[in-house]
């Protein structure tokens, strides 16, 4: 098992697959999702973009905590794993004190499930390497310090022989990944097993 943490643009990754932090309708969105769809269009033209959009439409829906796979149609990574994490409905970051509420812990479990689903899809498709961004930490608003703990712990426990690259475009997310688990993040989880 190899887990690396890097900063950069996920669309340039040359692993077997990259992960799209997707919405449940698998529609083109903002953040990482928008960057991936945009890169497919830039590199492969309108046809590749339409193929990706159609592949997502054909799948139709992916529930929170799960993941599905499509070809990338134009990127260096041949596949895109679309993982749906939870939309954070918990307290705002400045109001977030330990321990997390039962509803917030449910969202922790959903996020852990999304990371597990990515690794399951890799195994099902014989993929040996994957690049994963922060799932749910952008417009879905999941606290980055808690998300970093989940990402690292799930990948360390379950990646097996899959090479995992946890990637961040932003400095603050990169710091959270590199320093996780922090005492503050662990206190919020209060021993919760996901």
Outline where the language-model segments fall:
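Macrodomain-like recognition of ADP-ribose-binding/processing modules
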Residues: 1-194
